């Protein structure tokens, strides 16, 4: 009998609506290096759920465990009700996967790539042609069906991979950094296709990203840093928890301004390049009051509502950027010492 789940961060899934994905105290270690540290969460059916965090935070490792490509060191995970450790074949049959790196065969056509995939997933022979045509139309590639993939742009290849990932009608689509390296316009096009697919077929989407605009497309996001899940909620709720506006100042003496803000206003500011950054409630009244009392040459003032980057900064103390090199280098060094490859 499956034991009852512990309290799951940020979920209201009930016994009458079983989760599409359920993760309980999931851990993955590589020797002494912990890549995923006791994650617990649930994803609702039909939800677009995202993991936001810098490279090296543990996002891709988590997806690999959920897709049965890595064995958990400890804990449990269930995808479409199947245990990823005990029922890996059933998990794989019910999911589609799109990873960061392209995995298409660019020597053959778009149609041939999809036909090969249809054979792997045992799609009935008499359904293959119709299914392939349907998916190519869904991602606006019908007119390129007979063209070799090597002639495609990066955005077209990504759309073809989405078509391939959906060809066998999976219940869940996993997207690991689906638009990395693509320009903003192409990224937006890809997201339009993803949302259209969800409306048409009710698919659950689980994705990882370090792009703020992509995270805004999610119904809920989990924020990861240093192998841990540190927050989980809707983008709007996470930003609302900031409790105010974000102010950035550039002054003639930033050090003196930091001291003044702390002494006179009880505000803690931090330096970002040549600007000072802090949060206050009611910035529209705070800024005039500050300028009246500052007696410091203020060169620039910027007031913005909080962003997800501000949320991440508040939770972790650093901005979301490519901070994964050190973690990845440590992991590779550990695997080399063990005679493996990271």
Predicted regions and their residues:
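Conserved ABC ATPase "signature" region
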Residues: 115, 119, 126-144
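ABC ATPase "signature
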Residues: 232-233
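Short, charged/small-residue-rich alpha-helical element at the C-terminal edge
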Residues: 244-319
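Helical segment within the ABC ATPase nucleotide-binding domain
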Residues: 188-201
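Conserved catalytic motifs of ABC-family nucleotide-binding domains
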Residues: 169
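Catalytic Walker B motif of ABC-type/P-loop ATPase nucleotide-binding domains
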Residues: 173-176
């Amino acid at each position: 009998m499956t034991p009852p789940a512990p309290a799951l961060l940020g979920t209201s899934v009930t016994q009458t609506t079983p989760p599409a994905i359920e993760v309980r105290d999931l851990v993955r270690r590589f020797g002494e290096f912990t890549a995923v540290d006791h994650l617990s969460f649930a994803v609702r059916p039909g939800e677009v759920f995202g993991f936001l965090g810098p490279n090296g935070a543990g996002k891709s490792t988590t997806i690999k465990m959920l897709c049965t490509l890595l064995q958990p060191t400890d804990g449990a995970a269930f995808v479409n009700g199947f245990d990823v450790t005990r029922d890996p074949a059933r998990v794989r049959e019910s999911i589609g996967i799109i990873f960061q790196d392209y995995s298409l065969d660019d020597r053959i056509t778009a149609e041939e790539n999809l036909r090969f995939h249809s054979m792997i997933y045992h799609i009935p022979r008499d359904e293959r042609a119709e299914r392939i045509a349907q998916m190519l139309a869904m991602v606006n590639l019908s007119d390129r069906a007979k063209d070799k993939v090597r002639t495609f742009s990066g955005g077209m290849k990504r759309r073809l991979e989405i078509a391939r990932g959906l060809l066998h009608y999976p219940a869940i689509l996993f997207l690991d950094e689906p638009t990395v390296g693509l320009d903003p316009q192409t990224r937006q096009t890809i997201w339009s296709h993803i949302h259209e697919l969800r409306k048409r077929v009710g698919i659950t989407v689980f994705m990882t990203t370090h792009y703020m605009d992509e995270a805004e497309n999610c119904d809920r996001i989990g924020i990861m840093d240093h192998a841990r899940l540190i927050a989980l909620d809707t983008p709007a709720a996470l930003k609302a928890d900031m409790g105010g506006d974000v102010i950035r100042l550039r002054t003639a003496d930033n050090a003196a301004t930091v001291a003044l803000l702390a002494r006179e206003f009880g505000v803690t500011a931090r330096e970002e390049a040549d600007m000072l950054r802090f949060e206050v409630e009611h910035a529209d009244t705070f800024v005039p009051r500050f300028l009246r009392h500052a007696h410091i040459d203020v060169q620039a003032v910027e007031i913005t509502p909080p962003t997800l980057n501000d949320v991440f900064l508040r939770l972790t103390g650093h901005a979301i950027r490519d901070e994964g090199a050190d973690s990845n280098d440590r992991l590779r060094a550990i695997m080399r010492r063990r005679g493996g490859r990271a």
